[in-house]
């Protein structure tokens, strides 16, 4: 319902205008308080890069985080990642992921990032607590926060915003009247805007997701021969139609395409009842939640972000100046 309200044409949204105004006042006052120093932001001893967005829903932040980690590792940096760990309930906070960590403990995105990149990943409701743990470890020289653009309790040195290039900003209204956490003017203060799909606006960096060979959910084994053209598909992400469009573009005929809410907790019986023994394709983010109970007929599609080298060059140009003592909130 809200998605239709935000991204379609509906006069109903004006009924939510008073709530959007209240949200604007409260969030704006909070942001102003941090910028003026009335509220103190934690300043890390190493550079902090935020990868976030100004709208709710999945815009492709996690592939960007993985891309950034891999690019930094290739250039000799030792990155670590912090996240809120949404959807998980860890035994304690801050919680550092290890090989045995589950999505029930840490959330799906942190588990995926840790598996794909191999870098240290720490989750905590207060990201500053996660940052402190990474600092104390001595293992990292730069920290990337997955989401958290609006988490002003953590000072940052670089801000990257990912935009859905197809849906853009919907009706451009603030929550709950529209999908925006912050007004579009907030983008004037960020270091780079990444456009995921669609046509990038002037000054934005174009990003596309490149699909790899499907892998079996149960054991990550790569498919040795093409999957049947006719498959079922599920996606428990912020915008499932994007995944289904990717599969259709790869030539798959989707008998069933079922979208679930972001961070949906899947159950084996639920999925078997819905899809039976038929070949089933899902996102890698969903696969990390289904691995322990997956059937042999369940597969996921790995995707990687492809971004211009000029984006990394821009970031690296900023990093040398961050080795000197820094002050302020970076907001």
UniProtKB/Swiss-Prot annotation:
Question: Would the keyword Nucleotide-binding be found if you checked this record's keyword annotation?
Answer: yes
**A biological process from GO:** lipid A biosynthetic process
Any one Gene Ontology MF annotation carried by this entry is: tetraacyldisaccharide 4'-kinase activity
User: What is catalysed by this protein?
Assistant: a lipid A disaccharide + ATP = a lipid IVA + ADP + H(+)
Residues holding ATP: 55-62
Query: InterPro entries from the xrefs?
Result: LpxK, P-loop_NTPase
Quote the pathway field. Answer: Glycolipid biosynthesis; lipid IV(A) biosynthesis; lipid IV(A) from (3R)-3-hydroxytetradecanoyl-[acyl-carrier-protein] and UDP-N-acetyl-alpha-D-glucosamine: step 6/6
Name the coiled-coil region(s).
none
Q: Does the keyword Thylakoid apply?
A: no
Entry function: Transfers the gamma-phosphate of ATP to the 4'-position of a tetraacyldisaccharide 1-phosphate intermediate (termed DS-1-P) to form tetraacyldisaccharide 1,4'-bis-phosphate (lipid IVA).
> What protein name applies here?
Tetraacyldisaccharide 4'-kinase
């Amino acid at each position: 319902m809200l998605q239709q309200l935000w991204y379609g044409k509906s006069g109903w949204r004006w009924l939510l205008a008073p709530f959007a105004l209240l949200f604007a006042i409260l969030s704006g006052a909070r942001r102003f308080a941090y910028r003026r120093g009335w509220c103190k932001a934690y300043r890390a001893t190493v550079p902090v890069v935020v990868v976030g967005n100004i709208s709710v829903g999945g815009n492709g932040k996690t592939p960007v985080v993985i891309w950034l980690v891999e690019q930094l590792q290739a250039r000799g940096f030792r990155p670590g990642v912090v996240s809120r760990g949404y959807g998980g309930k860890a035994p304690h906070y801050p919680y550092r992921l290890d090989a045995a960590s589950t999505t029930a403990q840490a959330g799906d995105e942190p588990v995926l990032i840790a598996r794909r990149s191999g870098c240290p990943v720490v989750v905590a409701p207060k990201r500053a607590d996660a940052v402190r743990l990474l600092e104390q470890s001595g293992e990292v020289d730069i920290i990337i926060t997955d989401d958290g653009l609006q988490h002003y309790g953590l000072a940052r040195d670089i801000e990257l915003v990912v935009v859905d290039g197809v849906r853009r900003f919907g009706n451009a209204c603030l929550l709950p009247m529209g999908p925006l956490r912050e007004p579009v003017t907030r983008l004037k203060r960020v270091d780079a805007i990444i456009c995921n799909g669609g046509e990038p606006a002037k000054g934005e960096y174009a990003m596309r997701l490149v699909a790899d060979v499907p892998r079996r959910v149960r054991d990550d084994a790569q498919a040795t021969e093409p999957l049947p053209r006719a498959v079922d598909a599920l996606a428990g992400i912020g915008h499932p139609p994007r995944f289904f469009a990717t599969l259709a573009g790869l030539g798959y005929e989707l008998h069933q395409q079922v979208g679930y809410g972001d961070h949906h907790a899947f159950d084996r019986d639920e999925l078997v009842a819905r899809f039976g023994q038929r070949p089933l394709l899902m996102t890698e983010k969903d696969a990390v939640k289904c691995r322990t109970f997956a059937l042999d007929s369940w597969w996921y599609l790995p995707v990687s972000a492809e971004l211009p080298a000029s984006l990394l060059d821009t970031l690296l140009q900023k990093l040398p100046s961050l080795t000197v003592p820094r002050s302020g909130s970076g907001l």
